[in-house]
């Protein structure tokens, strides 16, 4: 199946807080719109029509298979984009607007079809009337002179056509016409339907990404659908969360509750909760903020915007340090538990996976560099962790999982909220090693954790020979975010870089058995962890 996606324009100004992005690469719940369409029409050939900021689309879609990005010579109306996309195409095809996600699959419908929804006529959408699938009237984003409070059909932006060559003919004729209030695309659709009537199908699973108010509503609904343990009351703006991982979840709830009053600004407002082991839950205020994870992967922010973000994070990091605890023996036990014991236990769990057998016994090749086996690395860690990390006797309040996905920021980059805290560091609850917080941030900026968990990397591997060759598909940016972050956190990083990198390496090495659903991700994490560890201590052979 051929899928044509017109995406010639950037999103409207009220959605440009992430940058001047075309809709096709705009994020919805931590995934770009194209990712939803790619999975919706799996196995299809895609043609994305671009003009404004086309380079960004080319870069972001370069690692998808069977995707052709076509740049227009000049910007025209919607019909111009579609005409370029279907030129020299014939047979069946799907046209899916770049700002439209519909969970119903039109590909399963025989013949010509289109999806519609209903609303009161307005300038927001294009409305239509049909007679047995023949489009007889179109109101193209124009407010009619007469007041009409009745619901009318509107195009959501998904069409299946059985004869692309005839649509091309209809578009050619429509593009020759002048001074029409109706887009050439819809004039062509009207003419096409005279010969090939549509099955006009109502959908309730339509997410509109093209308008700010609808975008945030769509983001909310997609989030609720994709996470089984989250329910969102849209009317009240309340998110209720449950979890099967009861111990961890209760620790999370208690972290929210134990925060000192003057630090509660960092968390969502809590309305109700239960820490009952049988049915724990928490209901909290829902924020339609983007996560730093989304900004990092999909945003197009300036250096000044990133500086503001990092300064906001630094303020919270520093503010947490107003609350400290000292208990030498208990702190040392917590450090050992979190850094050494946990890593060794995770390695023991990984050993049970036969796919990793050779990695424990044989030298490991990562991008051509030879490292010691994991059995030997284990012995190295038993020496280097106590030497470098057992040197503090004071903890302060920490979040415990301060990765980019757990940090939300408002559209003006002024207010930060943190979610999904760990709630446990050894035998401590809200207290822990502040270097652990920095390592969590490093593992996004330095180790590219966010790219790995979204499969934004290339990898070849040979399990029998313990060989990994991988490359993270990092973003092309005008600013070095790692350097910018280190500059903002200069005082915190100075003198601690190797210790932070050691903890960062341990994060990658200890998370491998937790990602058993993807051997690719596991091996990318292993390669990354060994590369970072080698900066701290020589593990080459």
Regions found by a protein language model. Give the residues of each.
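Conserved kinase catalytic-core helix
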Residues: 259, 295-357, 374-391, 491
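Conserved core of the sugar-phosphate nucleotidyltransferase
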Residues: 101-178
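Active-site activation/catalytic loop segments of kinase-like enzymes and analogous catalytic loops
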Residues: 422-488, 505-519
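A glycine-centered beta->alpha junction motif in the catalytic cores
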Residues: 9-12, 276-309, 315-325, 353-361, ...
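Conserved alpha/beta core of the MobA/IspD/sugar-nucleotide pyrophosphorylase nucleotidyltransferase superfamily
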Residues: 3-6, 152-235
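Active-site acidic catalytic loop and adjacent metal/ATP-binding pocket
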Residues: 379-432
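ATP-binding glycine-rich loop module of kinase domains
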Residues: 227-258, 285, 292-302
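Conserved N-terminal catalytic core of the sugar/cofactor nucleotidyltransferase
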Residues: 2-13, 19, 26-95, 177
